[in-house]
């Protein structure tokens, strides 16, 4: 019997007819993960669907792709409806997809990504965050009344900062009603206005379990709250939208409590250390001021007070001397002028000239008297002012405020090195003197 050999084309066409005629392959419901996806604008889409053990090529025509309500991405798990056929040019079978939608968890991830993008554009993630108070008095806890979360928070707060008051707002944290309950309790706690901090959260779980904390309404309630919020949802690797919107994110409930309150003993120790430093600073400042006072007290101003007004006394003497010299000079000048006038009058015999000269002489005498009086008054004012200035600088004024000076044998004592035990001293005050005997002498240490 002679064997009949088929061409590759003939075999491929035969197999294609088999594929197209099979009723089970005419409408296939398939689930898998998108692979090798490269988006092509305004064109047919070519990619693969795979699972853990197999892969199939997929084609989605432009008309079907434009009807999708989501954007397919690499690694997304989807459910598709289509037909299986053979592509003759390559001899491989493939699915022609007519409809596609995210599969289960994949849909949640898709919705989560879209919501993140939306809220991110609105600035809910990057907006200004509220600072947590350092010493909170009341803390609101929005979580389930049962479970490890509330126990961990209570234990941590009592251990670190037992003076803080925890107020639990029992809340559903899983299920269809959870998101509304979370929003309601956030708003209740925030409306009371007497909470310093708010902690919201729950334990770990699947994305479906954590989904209430990915709801848009929860994110907006957190963003609108005026109370600083710490979010602790799931495990450390779980990051929900609530975590991203909250003022602070904590990896665990224990970490949330640690962020909310300080360690009381450490704060008390810090306060004690600061008080000690303050006391030391005060004592150091007091010592500096005391030493400065002692240096001033021992300065020449108090030891030799007459030196304060030596210069002013000399200046006053010079001014007084110039005053008398000026008055004498003016008097002599006017006297000479008067004598000259008298001599001229004596030489003139007419009575009219004599009378006129007498009148002129009287006028000059009055003018001289006025000028001398005015000059004397001016000099007297200058003298009085100088005396007042000297009086302000007088050591008697200083002694009148409680200061004194000491003499030994009518000599001012300037230093303790001039004294010996049993010396007799005279202490001078503003209103009298006191006699004293030296018993002990204590020299001041030198300053370096």
Swiss-Prot record:
Catalytic activity as recorded in UniProt: Exonucleolytic cleavage in either 5'- to 3'- or 3'- to 5'-direction to yield nucleoside 5'-phosphates
Keywords: Cytoplasm, Exonuclease, Hydrolase, Nuclease
Protein origin, superkingdom: Bacteria
Gene Ontology molecular function, alphabetical: exodeoxyribonuclease VII activity; nucleic acid binding
GO BP terms: DNA catabolic process
EC id: 3.1.11.6
Pfam families reported in the protein's UniProt record: Exonuc_VII_L, tRNA_anti_2
One of the record's GO cellular component terms: exodeoxyribonuclease VII complex
InterPro entries given in the database record: Exonuc_VII_L, Exonuc_VII_lsu_C, OB-fold_nuc-bd_dom
Cellular localization per UniProt: Cytoplasm
Role: Bidirectionally degrades single-stranded DNA into large acid-insoluble oligonucleotides, which are then degraded further into small acid-soluble oligonucleotides.
Stored HAMAP family: Exonuc_7_L
Family named by the database record: Belongs to the XseA family.
Subunit organization: Heterooligomer composed of large and small subunits.
Protein name: Exodeoxyribonuclease 7 large subunit
Protein source organism: Enterococcus faecalis (strain ATCC 700802 / V583)
Taxonomic lineage: Bacteria, Bacillati, Bacillota, Bacilli, Lactobacillales
